[in-house]
Design a protein with these regions (language model features):
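Bulky hydrophobic segments
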Residues: 18-202, 221-348
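Sec-dependent N-terminal signal peptides
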Residues: 4-13
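Alpha-helical segment that forms one wall of the substrate-binding/catalytic cleft
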Residues: 212, 216, 220-222
Length: 348
């Protein structure tokens, strides 16, 4: 029966494979998993929606300091798997080889490059944890975000074929990494602060966030299935190439065009007179958590938007039946109601 489902999935994939923007990989190339891969320690410090943003600290405006925020295809820098908290510090100090910020595309709307990179890294990490023991029950713990984050993996009989197992593990990893991104938006809304005393409500459900996260998951899945996950160096280089390619296909804008689009939606999507971290600097939010999504519609854009998707089933296996992110009571839950036992992904 499973063979029939894999055949149906294989027949469905050509449509995704012929997608001119982000084709799914059908010719699977396996690579050894990285047993000692450290987890992504923290999220990259970026970005409030808008550009040339003013800042206040401890309620006091900081004059002469602005956050530029705008990137171009030529200023992305080099991707670096986020394997230590020091990576976030380097980003803040401008010492990292990679750059993070916002970039406009005519078919994908605004893209937050930090969100793309974060979910790609989580997908790569989860794949390397899941693939060696695919089908076995297990738990993968992450640091607290209001609650204790636990990826619960369920027991099942996995496919017999090596490539089929590899493919299933990659898609499952992307699905779970996107659930982690979903929860981060919820946690920010309920008061999560990665830096104590610095509110992150400004960033919760920002209009470009989850589309960017899903883009990162899909990029990492393609990189894994193309055989570029055998080393961190190979993964990082593949991310550089894949990110530039998909942004080009989404019709990436120049710096001037991105800034002009920000100016057109000032007062509608964001308020340039507010300062970071004022919650109402961001006026437009997107609360849609789906894995099948269009970018938040941008006024004045005439190009058709590009739909990003994650399949519900791979080879007859429903991804949500194989594992989920669970949130258990934490030490500091802020405004989040305490669950009776835990919040599963179905409660998001």
């Amino acid at each position: 029966m499973r063979k029939a489902f894999w055949l149906l999935f294989a027949l469905a994939l050509p449509a995704l494979a012929q997608d001119p923007v982000l084709p799914a990989v059908t010719a699977i190339h396996t690579a050894p998993t990285l047993g000692e891969l450290p987890p992504p320690e923290s999220l990259r410090p970026c970005c409030a929606f808008g550009y040339d943003l003013h800042v206040r600290a401890a309620g006091i405006p900081i004059p002469m300091y602005q956050i530029g925020n705008v990137l171009t295809l030529g200023t992305l820098g080099k991707h670096h798997y986020n394997d230590s908290a020091f990576g976030a510090v380097k980003n803040l100090l401008g010492l990292s080889e990679e750059q993070n910020g916002l970039i406009y595309t005519r078919r994908g709307g605004f893209i937050d490059i930090a969100h793309v990179r974060d979910t790609a890294d989580n997908t790569f990490y989860l794949f390397n944890r899941i693939a060696p023991t695919l089908g076995q029950a297990g738990r993968i713990f992450y640091s607290e975000e209001l609650g204790v984050r636990r990826v619960q993996l369920n027991a099942y009989t996995p496919p017999a074929g090596v490539r089929q197992r590899y493919q299933l593990a990659a898609w499952l990893a992307g699905h779970l990494a996107f659930e982690i991104a979903q929860w981060h938006e919820i946690a920010q809304w309920y008061g999560f602060q990665s830096v104590p005393g610095f509110s992150e409500e400004i960033s919760a459900f920002s209009p470009e966030d989850l589309y960017s996260n899903l883009l990162g998951a899909r990029l990492a899945i393609n990189i894994i299935l193309s055989g570029h996950g055998g080393s961190l160096e190979d993964y990082n280089q593949a991310m550089d190439a894949a990110l530039k390619q998909v942004l080009t296909r989404l019709l990436v804008a120049t710096r001037g065009e991105t800034e002009a689009m920000f100016q057109q939606i000032d007062g509608d999507w964001w308020n340039s007179h507010r300062r970071v971290p004022d919650k109402f600097l961001v006026l437009k939010r997107n609360y849609d958590l789906q894995e099948n999504r269009l970018p938040t519609p941008v006024p004045f854009e005439t190009m058709p938007p590009y739909r990003l998707t994650m399949p519900e089933q791979v080879g007859g296996f429903r991804l949500r039946d194989l594992g989920e992110l669970q949130i258990y009571p934490g030490h500091d839950m802020q405004a989040l109601p305490v669950p009776a036992q835990y919040y599963g992904a179905g409660a998001f």
